[in-house]
Design a protein with these regions (language model features):
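In a subset of proteins, long, contiguous C-terminal domains/tails are tracked
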Residues: 3-4, 8-10, 334, 387, ...
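Short, function-defining helix-loop hinge/capping sites that tune catalysis or transport
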Residues: 75-77, 160-162, 349, 403, ...
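Short helix-capping segments at alpha-helix termini
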Residues: 250-255, 284-285, 358-366
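Substrate-binding cleft/loops of secretory-pathway carbohydrate-active enzymes
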Residues: 268-285, 393
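Divalent metal-binding segments
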Residues: 2-8, 13, 17-276, 291-347, ...
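Residue-level recognition of conserved beta-strand edge/terminus positions
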Residues: 112, 143, 395, 502-505, ...
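His/Asp/Glu-enriched, well-ordered alpha-helical/loop segment
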Residues: 329-339, 343-369, 373-374, 379-383, ...
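Short conserved micro-motifs at the rims of enzyme active sites and ligand-binding pockets
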Residues: 270, 302-306, 383, 404, ...
Length: 612
């Protein structure tokens, strides 16, 4: 047998405990056929074999996000300006102004998730007046975690919010002394006001949604992600909003493997939704690139406990158990796996009561099910999860909300939030993920950094000793495979498994902790095919697809901020008046000139600010 692809001269970390290290792999028909030495892989070389010298790069199994809103995120990716990783608010506001200047009527500028104020040098959020100055005429919507959204005056007008607009249930339209909306929307604690407002913005046409999803997958491939479990999401209707991803699958253009769960959209009609789906959708229908994965993360709306740590923990309504039980009972009867969003231990206790009651009547008997999030779950409830054969999918929400959690509950409580080590010690399946794109970043390296370092994106230490790098990697690969019932099929670099790997820009196992969050892939392989390549390997990868529309934020800001990005020569980095020149700070920040270009005339003197 001749291999289709051989990768050699690498430092492979296989996540296979029986064969943890290798220098080469051979791949045939999309699966590993040899994992070992260069000589062992080269023995399968034929005349048509592609051979790639990895030049000593660290290579890992392709990362697998156990909770990513990829389908919804893909439809909107080309509409959204990314503030993920941006080092200062001054930079972020300048990016916002630049995009507002490029955005045609009636489109909005949207900053949706992946950032918080603690990442900025200024350690604060933008003010509403700053948004109005940056974009006086273009509608701007800035989403901040699950707790609030900022709208400029133009966005308030097109959204139709006036002094006569009532507050929706669970939300607040903040008003000034005269009763006029200020532009601040607050979840108290329900985030529906934020998402329903976002949904008022224009959508991309189908052709552009296809392009948008391809751009998002390319960005995920750049970060070494090769698989994801899509958790559904609000305003993500089945089957309408799955048209794009199904077309890409049909055209063999998926570069990320997707297992998708179905998320109910109709309060008080959840059971009807699931009865319709279990009768029309075959469990696990699809293939290794796109397959159905069961129900959730929303099973009933009364069981949703949004994790807004700026607000007190919400008590779920007394009707929750009566509404959740028939849905779970139906899913167990139909042998449909399910997942359920649950942040707080108090919620989890009540949900487990329902699960145990159903299990007494209709045994789960190995049916895959799991909680998503579980930040404050107790050891007792971890044991109950294990007894029912469940798992826990954890995400890095504390990396973005840790400061708020500590402020409300204290540093001691944050030390084991979520209690990943206890979950592992109890033998509960654990998979890692991000919960991107509306709150956390989709960057898996931000998540891996948080798991290893115990720090937030703002640098706050939540716990002194994080997970080992090996354990963190296992959770983001082999661990996540359990949550789509694909354990043994992917997650390891092992003979017989799907050939998904990422060669990294730096050695994850030896770089300084702070450098982890800047790692990316230089060569990403899915099913034995190169889907992304950069640096020394760039010529081996497919060409990038032009971004549509041409005014999309992705044209100038192609994803997560990068320390070596050309954007650095365009943004203004200082956060206070220049001590030398005492220039007009806002004028400099809001200018379209490259005010921090150290190769320019003023930059040669150490500061371009003097131009202002």
């Amino acid at each position: 047998m001749n291999a289709d692809l051989i990768l050699f001269n690498g430092q492979f970390h296989t996540v296979d405990r029986e064969n943890p290290r290798a220098s080469a792999v051979a791949i045939s028909n999309g699966r590993f056929v040899a994992v070992g030495t260069d000589a062992e892989a080269m023995a399968l070389r034929g005349s048509g074999t592609q051979v790639i010298d990895l030049k000593g790069r660290c290579v890992i199994p392709g990362l697998n996000d156990s909770h990513l809103h990829l389908i919804r995120g893909g439809l909107n990716y080309n509409l959204e300006l990314r503030w993920e990783g941006v080092p200062s608010l001054a930079d972020a506001l300048r990016m916002l102004k630049d995009q507002a200047d490029r955005t045609p009527t009636p489109q909005w500028v949207r900053v949706v998730g992946g950032w918080n104020e603690f990442q900025f040098a200024e350690k604060r959020m933008p003010t509403l007046e700053e948004l109005n100055q940056a974009a006086p005429d273009t509608p701007v919507f800035v989403l901040h975690l699950y707790d609030r959204a900022l709208l400029n005056r133009a966005a308030l007008r097109v959204a139709g919010y006036t002094r006569n607009t009532p507050n929706p249930p669970g939300g607040e339209i903040v008003r000034d002394a005269n009763g006029e909306p200020t532009g601040m929307l607050v979840a108290r604690p329900n985030a529906m006001i934020l998402y329903s407002t976002l949904a008022k913005g224009p959508k991309l046409p189908l052709e552009y949604q296809v392009n948008s999803t391809r751009q998002f997958m390319r960005e995920l491939n750049r970060l070494g992600l090769t698989s994801a479990i899509d958790a559904g999401g609000g305003f993500q209707n089945y089957p309408d909003d799955y048209q794009v991803i199904e077309q890409l699958a049909k055209d063999q253009q998926l570069t990320v493997r997707i297992a998708y769960n179905l998320f109910t959209q109709k309060p008080k009609e959840e059971l009807t939704d699931f009865k319709n789906w279990t009768s029309s959708v075959t469990l696990h229908q699809g293939d290794d690139y796109l397959r159905h994965n069961g129900a959730g993360e929303m099973l009933v709306f009364s069981a949703a406990d949004f994790e807004d740590f700026l607000e007190p923990r919400p008590d779920l309504p007394q009707t929750m158990e009566d509404e959740l039980e028939p849905v779970v009972r139906h899913l167990v009867e139909q042998r449909w796996p399910f997942r359920l969003h649950a942040t707080y231990n108090e919620s989890i206790s009540r949900m487990l009561d329902v699960f145990e009651k159903v299990n007494r009547d209709i045994p789960f008997n190995g049916l895959p099910w799991f909680f998503d999030h579980a930040e404050t779950i107790t050891p007792q409830n971890i044991e109950r999860v294990r007894a029912l054969g469940g798992g826990i999918a954890i995400q890095d929400r504390m990396a973005f909300q840790g400061e708020y959690f500590v402020e409300r509950y204290g540093a001691k409580a944050a030390e084991a939030t979520p209690p990943i080590k206890r979950m592992l010690a109890e033998g509960v399946p654990v998979g890692a993920g991000t919960d991107a794109t509306r709150v956390s970043s989709y960057n898996p390296w931000t998540s891996l950094y948080w798991m290893v370092s115990g720090r937030t994106v703002g640098g706050l230490e939540l716990h002194a000793e994080g997970l080992s790098r090996q354990t963190a990697l296992e959770l983001f690969t082999h661990g996540s495979a359990w949550f789509s019932s694909e354990q043994g099929k992917k997650g390891m670099i092992k003979v017989g498994q799907l050939a998904d790997v990422a060669a990294l820009s730096a050695d994850f196992f030896s770089v300084d902790e702070e450098a982890i969050k800047w790692i990316e892939s230089v060569l990403t392989v899915v099913g034995g095919k190169v889907v992304y390549a950069a640096g020394d390997f760039e010529k081996l990868g497919p060409a990038s697809v032009p971004v549509l529309p041409d005014w999309s934020p992705v044209v100038k800001v192609p994803g997560h901020w990068r320390p070596t990005s050309p954007m650095q020569t365009q943004v203004h980095h200082c956060s206070g008046p220049c001590g030398v020149h005492s220039h007009s700070h806002d004028k400099a920040r809001l200018s379209n000139a490259p005010v921090s270009d150290f190769a320019g005339f003023w930059g040669a003197f150490g500061c371009s600010c003097f131009a202002f």
